Amino acid sequence: MTRMLIAIFSMLLAGPVAARDGAPRIDEIVWYNIDSYCSFTRADHRFDYNDPESWRWVLFTNFPAGDGADPIESPFMRIDGQLKQLAQTGIRSLDGGAVRSYQSHDANPYLVEVSLLEGERGIESSAFSGVITVSRNGASSEIAYKGDCGA
């Protein structure tokens, strides 16, 4: 009985694999009816407007603050269970889009790169897809995403 309790206690303390190897965990933000400018989900996620359970985001942005403001300059992500607002640190061109670099506002910041590959353009929105990579202390995680930006 004692061995079993020790084994169970050890498993509970171990936490997820990402926590053990030090890689940041990219979590979903569950926010039904979010009023965002850009909303990105995991690439394999099926979004259904009428299903509140499907409103799961890996990155979102607020609407631009004013004329000419960059709506993707300060996105939000949930990393290691905490909602983080990111600050843009750079942009570089990529065939078919761009790679934007960000960092969190922590003393030991998370570094984030988002490849924005342009997809279909509509009257009020543009589709994007790519990869989001989150790094910290030499370890990183990445996910493929899809989504759009616009009103």
Stretches found by the model and what they are:
Residues 1-8:
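Sec-dependent signal peptide recognition
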Residues 20-151:
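Cysteine-centric segments in proteins
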